[in-house]
């Protein structure tokens, strides 16, 4: 399920909640996969993940779509694409894919995998592009 939001035509984003989490019995805050457009500084399609827990220090998050894998750097409970050059390919993979898997490690050492559906992603992306163009 994809939701899109627009804040005064300046910040627009897609937010998706996971359809599956492993392990499923963790006590954690809200977690989501996001794509954000920042109109004022002309930043578009910025991917990020909020996990609802603090990451292991200096750890990387692995985001996979089909056979494609991307590394995200972490700060507290958020992660962003480590190599901005891969952003266009990541978005292309999201448009063509069915699911995103996000693998991360908490500050306690717990390995966690969240799975997100990409149903409706292309339509939601078009909506935020139109709203924040």
Where do the PLM segments sit?
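A generic "folded-domain core" signal
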Residues: 1-133
